[in-house]
Curated annotation (Swiss-Prot):
It comes from Lacticaseibacillus paracasei (strain ATCC 334 / BCRC 17002 / CCUG 31169 / CIP 107868 / KCTC 3260 / NRRL B-441). Keywords: Cytoplasm, DNA replication, DNA-directed DNA polymerase, Exonuclease, Hydrolase, Nuclease, Nucleotidyltransferase, Transferase. NCBIfam families: dnaq (TIGR00573), polC_Gram_pos (TIGR01405), PRK00448.1 (NF001688). This is DNA polymerase III PolC-type. Residues 421-577 form the Exonuclease domain. Its main location: cytoplasm. Signal peptide: none annotated.
Length: 1444
């Protein structure tokens, strides 16, 4: 089966191998390969790609850059983009501007210089460039404007018109300079032209465009290049060597080329430039591509434009720069701990980079273990399959205990109130009970809330105290020198504690030092009960943000004058204990020792636990599903600051999983570092394997003082290896990779720096965590001996990899749609029942044949359930009083019409009798739309005939063979959209309905900001090229998650969501109404059904118009003369064009209100529905109107109804003219995608005497065409709204301002039309300087002006009557504004005012401010505009208040 255009596009994306953030851009979802024209002689491929909307420039540029690279060995490439619904903004214009200027082949330097100095702005649907005077404006129009406009259109800005305007302020001072420059340029052009003639006469040497680069003189490879970072000033000659990360070749007006490339040696970066001298240089320019290593020699000069040092290259040549290799002999290691750019704001490279490197190194497998997420899995699967590598699917979870005990050895029911306590605290030389020493031990003995004895001893550790210890504890060497020995103090303390309950704050820390000390000296283990006040506080108050001793002391008013001295801390902890015990007794009835642990693990106990890292792998396919469930639980049920996995849940889902001890943040390493071997052994028993990492990875722990030095670090690692041996668990060496190469470390450093103090990694230097080779790892662990190093690095990593099944896949290989019993029969029944009701039984042949063809395709290909879901959603919305508009080509399906999914009838134009089902069809194209037929009575029964049918072929929806998966997009009212979404839950269940998830990554501009902040905070001055390199390195990293605005995924009843993806809340918002897919929905688009349930203003407005008027929208005629007159003038409105500043009466009418479309209406004056369809198609298409139909109409060749408007017209026109159906369809498909018409089809068209030549030429110009069904649905809604504008104007304006308007100048609107006109003029006078908000306001003011000119009034808000959101009709001529129309008054305040008013009337401005939550600024606004004239400033007391 031939690939669909979308499938071809997906295949192209795979070939382009785009960066993950680009590949996951939601705008690529609609992508299609519309055409590829192959020019065999010139070896050029012309690609035409199609999208729904203009691509973000970063995405477009990535495709445009990659395309020639991928095909460079085959052919040159050219790229055009066709966009179905282009929404052009100032931001998009600016983002594409430099690309457009570079690729527009502008002929003169003056024009290029002018363009490079400014960016066009959008004014009245045109892109405007300002010039200094009229001469330059004319010169720009002659030399470059058309090329700029055409280049914009080629990249998707269909319909964009460019305009040059004179900036009068600069005109006088610039005239002389311009004339001199033009004279000079004219002379240069003449000289250049002569040179071109001379060159063309000479025989040109042909040079291949592939192979090594060699330009200028050969450079000696023995000469060492200069480090870029050392070049800080202009120099006559430098030689550098580096990696090319950006390249551009510009065509100059002199016909020479300018090569500009950015190169880095990772110490810094440079821009290098070189001008061509003939075709040999140009061929060499073509060889220079991103990813190459070049040696460059030239001068360093300050660039006149950028003011930065730039290399003017004289000599350039390719140098060999081999990628890192893994030269270890024999079997290679497997990396089992690896983070990709899906580890949120923490790691750099996509998994595909690691897979490529692992394959090159000969590794048989590789793991992915991102922080708390699995979002790299789809890409990992694709990359691994492509490389033939085994992928190990894992995750680094945040493991927490379900609850930490409050008390230890607490089995006896000892009465807490009367118990005797020893509250103690230790001060130490560090945090490790294994490697640090106690230097102070203090305690108080308490009973009945009073101190009855004290213990305080200093201990000499036998070595000088560190500065950190002295500063933290305020204990000096003099204070401990000559003190008692550790063993003596411990013996005394054991006696002091005899029989008492021991108490401490974070007591496990203190007990750990005692346990290790007692063991070290052969003393008896602690057997006293122990209470931890830290955990007691957490158990009682999980809502508190911290439970530090000093924080709690303040809350409970306990004195703590010398915090971090043992005696002070001990006494404060004692008094805190009594306060907490009283709360425990009051809250939970805890009065005895054995009751303190009753609530361990209850409620939100998981929030109080400190997370530890652990690695979890899916060992089997069933294990992968358990992993999906585990990650879902952590994101949905156990999310607190980070996704958490309670140990009990991991145990419950452990089947098919492998659990490893992870990094230094894992509990085994932490226990070994801080508590000792016994504790570490107990923790290690939980895991399937243990992990250790290279010494440099632990460097931050040494820097922080948590580990005293490398000797202690090695001791910890050796003891973990020993524990593994004792427990018979493999110990494996992992790299904890966060980026690919060592030079990538700077990208992570910048990323972490951007997060400030919120990220604990900012407190110390970052470790070296690049992707290490086997040989590197063996070197890192060589201190263990060759045999042991090989065991940890190679043997055990492969052993664990072998534990995992080979055939695990996280992505399905086909589409799974929900099954609805009897759906095929029900659909057929509904369709045929409606058809018989409308057209009789038996059906007319044309209807019966059409339905038979459609139903065979729909049912035969399993599409019935998709129709069924859409049908149920639409019927539900209609029942609830909201019409639904269809989008796209679903109106091409008569079955969809008969099922009630769409109002659009695709049959040929026809009459239909609602009484006796008589019908009469017009099948030869003589009528464009059934709505245009003249009124007529039924010849059989005399009833008024209904008119319908728009002649739309079914093939435009499901393809010529009817086997294309239907994409049914529906426009629900924006108000009703949430209800429609929730109805899917009703239909399929909450566990089978999910919002489509998205992943937000660091964008290029954001990354640029990170780099600039890093530059500022580190006191550096980076070159622009280096900033660009660093920003490139940080783009694409996961920042957050989100949700598709309309997409709902439906899981089949016999499956669950974990068969496809984990789930989560968007952006970790635990209060979100919907859960989303954890995977970006694009990655599972082909596996699970997605319904696009969109929100739109038109159905909302129709509902409001119906509510206010009582008129049923479907009863509104489609050929009302007054409505049709709006499209050719303003007479229907009772105003002149001058009054409303528009020659057409379509302001505020969907599809027809913009200046661009109003201009089309002025030229064409449509009078029928079919002509309005033409306008819709012409305005949405690319190269359909401008330079095409517009010219044909102007020249009088054809009329509006004859030109090609919508794509479907082509197929139906050609069929009506006698061409074969399949050829007509194929020609339509080629033309609508901008692919032209192949020669043999053109020949067939020209041989058909019915096909006009102008028609063929028009087809050849078209780049994109709008579907007729889409246009029909939109215009049907537009005509209904327009009908109210003509016949119920006050209702229309009330609905428009309520539904469509967001920005208001209420003061102007309420003061009348002169004030509105003045406000409009103020905005229009700003021209290009007007803000986006002002331009949006201008549209609202235009409607307000029209409303006022028609004799209506807009009233300022009334505190006693206004609604919070909607405008209200006050009388036959007046509309009352809502509170939200007041500038700066948001929806919440508006609702609060109405709620407070309903409780009781406002007594004063003070009362309004207090109960309505209205700010002083808003009170002042209302006062100024006389809203509050009847209210005093303050509440006034009455003599009789309170007497009754």
């Amino acid at each position: 089966m031939a690939l669909s255009q979308h499938e071809m596009f997906e295949k192209l994306l795979d070939q382009l191998d785009l960066a993950a953030d680009v590949r996951q851009d939601p705008s690529l979802t609609s992508g299609t390969v519309q055409n590829v024209t192959i020019h065999e002689q010139s070896r050029r491929y012309d690609f035409t790609l199609g999208f729904d909307a203009i691509l973000p420039f970063q995405t477009f540029n990535a495709i445009a850059t990659k395309l020639p690279l991928v095909f460079q060995q085959i052919a040159a490439t050219d790229l055009s983009v066709v966009v179905t619904q282009p929404t052009i903004t100032d931001e998009l214009l600016a983002q594409y501007w430099q690309y457009v200027v570079t690729h527009a082949e502008i002929g003169t330097g003056i024009v290029r210089e002018l363009c490079e100095k400014q960016v066009p702005t959008l004014e009245n649907d045109r892109a405007v460039i300002k010039t200094e005077n009229e001469q330059i404006r004319q010169y720009l129009i002659q030399q470059g404007l058309g090329k700029l406009e055409e280049t914009y259109r080629q990249v998707g800005f269909s319909g964009l018109r460019m305009q040059a305007e004179v900036d009068e302020e600069q005109a006088a001072q610039s005239m002389a300079a311009f004339q001199a420059q033009r004279a000079e340029e004219t002379a240069k052009m003449a000289k250049a032209a002569a040179e071109v003639v001379k060159q063309q006469a000479a025989k040109q040497k042909q040079v291949q465009t592939d192979g090594p680069v060699q330009m200028g003189r050969q450079m000696k490879m023995t000469d060492a290049p200069q480090q870029m970072v050392t070049i800080t000033q202009e120099e006559r000659s430098v030689t550098v060597e580096g990696y090319v990360f950006d390249v551009e070749v510009r065509e100059l007006r002199s016909k020479r080329q300018l090569l500009i490339f950015k190169v880095t040696d990772y110490s810094s970066s440079f821009i290098a430039k070189k001008f061509s001298n003939g075709p040999e240089d140009e061929a060499m320019f073509a060889r220079i591509q991103k990813g190459q290593w070049l040696r460059v020699r030239g001068s360093v000069q300050e660039d006149n434009y950028s003011r930065e040092l730039t290399i003017n290259a004289q000599d350039i040549q390719t140098v060999s720069h081999p990628d890192p290799t893994d030269d270890a002999e024999g079997e290679k290691r497997v990396e089992l701990h690896l983070h990709t750019n899906m580890s949120q704001m923490d790691a750099m490279n996509p998994i595909s980079d690691y897979v490529k490197r692992a394959k090159e190194w000969g590794h048989k497998a590789i793991a992915v273990t991102d922080h708390a997420g699995l979002q790299a899995y789809p890409e990992a699967h694709s990359a691994a399959v492509k490389a033939g590598l085994k992928m190990l699917y894992g995750v680094e979870i945040n493991l927490v205990d379900d609850g930490t005990p409050v008390a230890y050895r607490a089995d006896e029911p000892r009465d807490l109130a009367s118990a005797e306590y020893v509250v103690f605290d230790v001060e130490t030389t560090g945090l490790s009970a294994v490697y640090d020493k106690v230097i102070e031990l203090a305690a108080v003995k308490m009973k009945d809330g009073k101190v009855i004895d004290q213990f305080e001893e200093m201990i000499d550790p036998g070595f000088p105290l560190s500065e950190l210890t002295i500063n933290l504890t305020h204990i000096t060497d003099d204070m401990v020198h000559g003190s008692k020995s550790e063993v003596d103090v411990f013996k005394l303390f054991q006696q002091f504690c005899d029989g008492a309950i021991m108490v401490g704050h974070n007591v496990t820390f203190d007990v750990g030092f005692l346990d290790n000390g007692y063991e070290r000296h052969g003393l008896a283990d602690i057997d006293n009960p122990v209470i931890d006040t830290l955990e007691l506080s957490r158990m009682l108050h999980p809502e508190r943000k911290n439970h530090k001793l000093d924080t709690l002391a303040k809350q409970y008013k306990v004195s703590l004058e010398h915090h971090h001295r043992a005696n002070a801390d001990a006494e404060a902890t004692g008094y805190l204990l009594y306060a907490l015990e009283k709360e425990a007794a009051k809250m939970y009835g805890m009065t005895t020792l054995n009751q303190l642990n009753d609530r361990v693990g209850a409620g939100d106990a998981y929030k109080a636990a400190r997370p530890s890292h652990a690695i979890v792998f899916a060992k089997t396919q069933a294990g992968l599903k358990n992993l999906f469930k585990l990650v879902s639980l952590s994101n949905v049920k156990y999310f607190y600051r980070v996704p958490r996995v309670p140990r009990s849940q991991l145990q419950k889902l452990r089947e098919g999983l492998l659990v490893g001890s992870a990094c230094s943040n894992g509990e085994v390493f932490t226990a070994m570092m801080q508590k000792g071997e016994a504790e570490a052994r107990a923790k290690a028993s939980f895991y399937d394997y243990l992990e250790v990492q290279p010494l440099p990875v632990y460097q931050p722990l040494i820097e922080a003082g948590l580990i005293k030095g490398e000797a202690h670090l090695k001791d910890i690692i050796q003891k973990i290896i020993k524990i593994g041996s004792e427990l018979e668990k493999p110990v494996v060496a992992t790299g904890d990779a966060h980026y690919l190469d060592q030079h990538d470390a700077i990208y992570r450093q910048i990323l972490i720096h951007s997060q400030g103090g919120a990220n604990p990694l900012n407190r110390h230097s970052l470790p070296d965590v690049h992707f290490r080779s086997t040989s590197e790892m063996l070197t890192d662990f060589s201190w263990l001996g060759e045999e042991k190093a090989h065991e940890l690095v190679v043997d055990n990593s492969n052993l664990i990899a072998n534990w995992v099944d080979d055939d695990i896949t996280p992505v399905k290989d086909k589409l799974y749609t929900p099954e609805v019993p009897g759906v095929e029969e029900n659909l057929k029944h509904d369709v045929m029942t409606t058809a018989h009701e409308l057209y009789g039984d038996p059906l007319p042949d044309i209807v019966a044949q059409r339905l038979d063809k459609e139903l065979k395709s729909i049912i035969g290909n399993g599409f019935s359930v998709i129709y069924n879901i859409a049908q149920r959603l639409v019927l539900k919305s209609n029942k609830d009083g909201y019409l639904v508009g269809s989008r796209g080509s679903v109106g091409s399906s008569l079955a969809a019409t008969m099922a009630g999914i769409t109002e659009v009838n695709p049959l040929p134009p026809h009459y239909r009798c609602p009484n006796c089902q008589y019908s009469e069809f017009f099948t030869h194209g003589e009528i464009g739309s059934g709505f245009d037929l003249p009124d007529k009575q039924c010849p059989k029964c005399g009833a008024d005939l209904h008119k319908d049918g728009h002649d739309i072929p079914f093939e435009t929806f499901l393809g010529f063979h009817g086997d294309k998966v239907p994409d049914i997009d529906l426009n629900f009212s924006g108000d009703y959209q949430p209800i429609a979404h929730n109805y899917i839950k009703v239909m399929f269940g909450e566990d089978h309905s999910f919002r489509a998830g998205t992943i937000g990554t660091v964008a290029d501009k954001t990354a640029y900001g990170y780099v600039k902040a890093y530059e500022r905070d580190t006191g550096q001055q980076l070159r622009g090229a280096e900033i660009d390199r660093l920003a490139q390195g940080d783009t694409g990293v996961k920042r957050t998650t989100g949700q598709h605005p309309a997409g709902i995924l439906i899981v089949p009843a016999d499956m669950d969501i974990y068969d496809f993806t984990p789930i989560q809340y968007p952006a970790d918002d635990q209060n979100a109404a919907w859960m989303t897919t954890h995977f970006d929905f694009h990655s599972i688009h082909d596996n699970i059904l997605k319904m696009d349930v969109l929100g739109h203003d038109d159905p909302t407005m129709i509902r409001m118009l119906q509510d206010l008027s009582g008129v049923e929208p479907k009863s509104i005629p489609t050929d009302d003369p007054g409505v049709m007159a709006l499209f050719s003038g303003t007479k229907s409105l009772g105003v002149t064009p001058e009054q409303i500043n528009s020659k057409m009466g379509t302001l505020g009418i969907p599809e027809f209100g913009t200046r661009f479309v109003r201009g089309m209406l002025e030229e064409t004056k449509p009078t029928t529905f079919s002509e309005l369809l033409q306008i819709s198609g012409l305005s949405h298409g690319t190269d359909v109107w401008l330079g095409n139909a517009e010219e044909l109409i102007k020249q009088g060749i054809v009329t509006l109804k004859e030109v090609i408007g919508c794509r479907d017209n082509i197929m139906m026109d050609l069929i009506h003219w006698g061409m074969e159906d399949s050829m007509a369809f194929n020609i339509m498909e080629h033309v609508r995608k901008g692919r032209g018409i192949p020669d043999d089809w053109q020949k067939a068209m020209r041989e058909n005497e019915n096909v006009p030549d102008w028609y063929i030429e028009s087809c050849l110009k078209i780049k994109y065409m709008f579907p007729k069904a889409h246009a029909t649905a939109y215009i049907l809604m537009a005509l209904r709204i327009a009908w109210f504008k003509v016949h119920y104007p006050l209702i229309y304006y009330t609905a428009y301002f309520s539904v469509r308007a967001e920005d208001f100048d209420l003061a102007a609107m309420s003061h009348g039309k002169e004030a509105v006109k003045a406000a409009m003029k103020e905005i229009t006078d700003k021209g290009m300087d007007a803000s986006t908000k002002e331009k949006q306001l201008l549209t609202v003011l235009e409607i307000a002006n029209e409303c006022l000119e028609r004799g209506f009034k807009i009233k300022m808000i009334d505190v006693t009557k206004s609604d919070s959101h909607n405008f209200l009709i006050q009388d036959d001529h007046t509309i009352l504004a809502p509170f939200r129309a007041v500038p700066g008054l948001g929806d919440n305040v508006a609702k609060q005012i109405v709620a407070a008013r309903e409780e009781k009337p406002f007594l004063s401005k003070e009362d309004l401010a207090n109960r309505g939550k209205v700010s002083k600024t808003l009170i002042d606004y209302m006062t100024t505009n006389h809203v509050l004239d009847d209210l005093p400033d303050e509440n006034q007391l009455s003599l009789f208040d309170g007497l009754f």
